[in-house]
């Protein structure tokens, strides 16, 4: 059976991921006019720029949807976001600033939950607004087929008939008006925005040019921290974790994780925390550029990693970072539920996150400027008395350290021999521009 349909399947049920915007509205109406039977499915992901979810299914019905459902995905989205924090599943960083994979997390939840809802309604053809150049077309493809093995894909934006008739936003708007809907195009921004409760992505248009900076963006989850006219007073915040799970902010507990994440967003957003500018590699290996917001994820991530470094040993932390980057890349590629990702998630959550219990106090200032003021945990392996410079009882003596250093003579001698070998083969040469001249007899050994 063909998985991807190039032309509209007339007379058949088609589920469309419906946002209520111009693109999906025009696509739904066009499919109905051409003889298909569209069903609209809208994901409530707690988008910060959406204020009336209930109105979206009603609009879909007006445009010809046979059925329209609003699927609440917030609980599942936050659960996956917390799992990503526990695993450090983030692979794109620039200058120490992290992209928290908020769009890939949203696609993992949307792609599975909407297709599951379609399957309940006997709808086995799915369409969405992703384009052939982006990541989402592959993410949705993978998650959709994982959820429903019988699924077929129809995307109006891959259908030449749709493109010929409604290839641009102006044509879509004119089509809506001609069909009796007074649908006016929204004012074009200098970039496009996609968001969910975990974060916002700003990209394309003017942001495709690297000389367009974050300063052209109007944050939807935070503030313009770069604008000196925006007053941002410093704020102390406490974050409490229990077995890797964030449970309290400023001493306040929450009825559920959704409310906790909303409060984390409010706190971090007041400062513009978690905003970053990234150049990344798309799944197809072409580079793209995005400006991201994720105030709540950033706040929780900072506190989590502070506890991590105080609780676990160096080798465990190294594995956390290495496996986390690997897992982050799988998440980005739409493989969050693949076996290799589940294996990494299980080990990181079981052996790392389970020990992360404690409270971190931070002072947030402007943007990503913050200080850690205190770290408290019964699980800390950081013990100030072990390395104190003051007199007193110690777990080891100066004589112990002399013995330990003497044992290092073995590998130091081996290293000197290797340096000499490198010099003899021409790989290394003594130079005033390096520290190598200080290695005695590097060039003169044996002369």
Curated annotation (Swiss-Prot):
GO terms for cellular component: cytoplasm. It catalyses: L-citrulline + L-aspartate + ATP = 2-(N(omega)-L-arginino)succinate + AMP + diphosphate + H(+). Its main location: cytoplasm. ATP binds at residues 17-25, 43, 129, 131, 136, 194. It comes from the Bacteria. Its EC number is 6.3.4.5. GO terms for molecular function: argininosuccinate synthase activity; ATP binding; protein homodimerization activity. It is found in: Cytoplasm. L-aspartate binds at residues 131, 135-136. SUPFAM superfamilies: Adenine nucleotide alpha hydrolases-like (SSF52402), Argininosuccinate synthetase, C-terminal domain (SSF69864). L-citrulline binds at residues 99, 135, 139, 192, 201, 203, 280. Signal peptide: none annotated. Pathway: Amino-acid biosynthesis; L-arginine biosynthesis; L-arginine from L-ornithine and carbamoyl phosphate: step 2/3. CDD domains: ASS (cd01999). Keywords: Amino-acid biosynthesis, Arginine biosynthesis, ATP-binding, Cytoplasm, Ligase, Nucleotide-binding. GO terms for biological process: argininosuccinate metabolic process; L-arginine biosynthetic process; urea cycle. Belongs to the argininosuccinate synthase family. Type 2 subfamily. Homotetramer. HAMAP family: Arg_succ_synth_type2 (MF_00581). This is Argininosuccinate synthase. It comes from Klebsiella pneumoniae (strain 342).
